[in-house]
């Protein structure tokens, strides 16, 4: 069966329908992050909040909300583990593993690797003691990252989730793709086939590629800091500074002049972040926290690094009077 269209938008994400046709060149070497995943759905996983309370009733007194109501991240030596709890009793769980710390060993089954990781962390092992997989097998990936050199042509375009993928750490995929939908909608509704549209699509291609590489910078730095949680938390503020600044600029901008995703076009922000990951290896945790706070100060609109928050924010759009 063949289908003809004047313009094709590939929204297949990892399916990469147009990419599979062979006309688009992949170039994952542009990305620094190298991670893989093992994941599944489970039932009867206890509430992490309840486990914390059982261990120490005072441990949650500063929590701004029940942690199980969020997309929970357990930061580990090899990477991190997600818990996404659904209302039907299922929980999506998975390890995202830094390949430099936990390379794929095909001689070890996915189940054995899963059990070895759980056994290494007593609190996680206890949580999964009575949980059970809803599918007989775990899913294990190879490298998660993908990147296409070309994102658009005269009669086709890839949405950001199809153009590339970095990592689920900061959950950027949906927001990035929606920003791409907005931009392609403007292009396709306001231009006709010809030079004007091709110029706009060329700019779209450049922007999406630059934004994906920027997400990679924000993610890769976090993985470099995994060995010290305080450094990891400090560098993660680069993402939150970029996200909150981007949201504010979107609100302040006209529909015709929207900022690049996560302020990827902001050279001052990129410069502020560029050397931080390297500095993490040379600084103590306290020194690195101060360095990150100083570098991000021009973009810190929501009280990031404020000691009273203890790295726990109920929301990141604090009133102007509540930012210290």
Where are each of the predicted segments found?
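Predominantly flavin-linked oxidoreductase catalytic cores and closely associated redox partners
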Residues: 1-126, 181
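Short, surface-exposed, charge-dense and proline/glycine-enriched linear segments
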Residues: 2-15, 59-68, 155-165, 220-236, ...
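Generic alpha-helix signal with a bias toward terminal, lower-confidence helices
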Residues: 15, 21, 50-54, 93-95, ...
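Short, surface-exposed, charged/polar-biased interaction segments
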Residues: 29-30, 39, 59, 104, ...
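Polar/charged alpha-helical tracts
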Residues: 53, 116-119, 130, 271-274, ...
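A general structural signal for short secondary-structure boundary/capping elements
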Residues: 54-59, 129-130, 140-141, 203, ...
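FAD/FMN-dependent oxidoreductases across multiple families
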Residues: 77-81, 85-87, 99-219
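C-terminal helical "tail/cap" subdomain of flavin- and related membrane-associated enzymes
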Residues: 187-324
